[in-house]
């Protein structure tokens, strides 16, 4: 008997389609004339790299589900995996059209700035000769041409690499397929045209033009560039079943990912359908996953264009954002003991507006302070040259107990984390690797000191990674406190992790997987009670993604009870506001601006009874019940007021903030007499506060 499918609720949106709407907002910034021209190139490249990762991970997962004998349905809209993949492909084709229009606009606007990307047919005869010589001497010697035959099977295509493909014809009329890798670290991707400064040609286009030189015995019947995207959704839980070192097993899995099945293939121009079918057969690709692109298959070359523009001097500065650098927080006097100051008052750092150096300086001070007996820390994504790691190494070398939980399963950072785990172990740190079935995504650091009063704690809880690079690019919050009730509970969290367990009960912190979702639901229930008693009730949430169905349903219940709900959700949002009878008391905006919005703030209650937290967790099921996450209450009145002001400012952002409407679209909004960019305002405030030495 066929299972009856429930009708989806009118306030639910599919997760994957919501993500595509987010990436469209990124693409819109590439076409936004209010964004400096060179920065719009960055948004175009980010859009493409985001989409690559989406196909590698999300589409890869859905395609794995399609292989299952059981039909898997998404729990909010009841779409099957197959239906979702089709909807994703259809939406991607629409976005590809928009991307091509925006790319052509960008290229058109770059021309008056002296920048042109051209094809070979735009060259003069002399220029063509120069580039032919360049091809013969600098590119051709490094190319490996493959003509497919029984003796030379179809080569393995690397993920996201560009290849030239051609249909060759012999004098006797037989056809053969040829494929040539175009990516090589030896030659440049962006080739200068010597006679025309600022004019460039992409190396893959030059290779494509000179294919006849590589296949002199054949006629080139068809030619194109292609690029494939491979599934990257590896099952990291299998490493717990391996009878080998955890780190070695993880290295093996990362190698395995490079050879997984393709999920998408892109061509740079229309090409013979039979040739497409042949390539699809070779790589086991569904022809519905083939895309034709009017835009270069890899947009990372735009950063070379930006570098060229920067070298042109001051007149090109207007093409970039105004230079900004993080300020040292006025909350701390850098020449005095940071530990002593934090004992007196809590500190809240706001990145990228304030410098992460205040935290790294604290770690170095702890590494050298005789009263410090241990430092415990969770690490998820680290900078290439990490001062955080250097400080921990110094602490271990100074005889401190240093315990570090390195999450090796941080997607696409596995290899970096493996190397850092070795470095920490070699320095004498105790390194552990997370829990079976649960990623440790929390941002938690505990410094333990032995004083005359006994053991005392300094705790840091953050919303973002311990990464000096991303702290200048992402908005994040970092609370540093000497409140002992927070420190004692953080110590319990680490004790559980060291035993391979998760904490069962908390009183101050919210800790997933067992003590976060339920406590959030309780606080929403409290607001529902106030609303039902005809008292003012309020919930304010800032997160990156909202997919947790349990929390969504509870927010709908709160809206129906009359609770005012304001949300800043940067990316995926499966909740549609403004639906009569369900979500008319919910307002949701998304901010996509210069910096990646990454901080998480939870607010419950009116000012006189407000509870406010910063957290590492989004409201996604993976965060609330399948990861170790930590949210910390902000107890200092000054810091609470500062967070309230930040949240309220973001809700007023009508420069980068787009409002989610009841029909599931995002629209521009007008809130202020003059448009307000919250990120720009926060930077201005950081500069002023640093000058005044007050906050």
PLM segments and residue spans:
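Hydrophobic alpha/beta core scaffold segments
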Residues: 564-568
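N-terminal localization/anchoring segments of enzymes in phospholipid and broader phosphate metabolism
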Residues: 1-539, 557-561, 573-695
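Glycine/threonine-rich ATP-lid/beta-loop region of ATP-binding domains
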Residues: 549-556
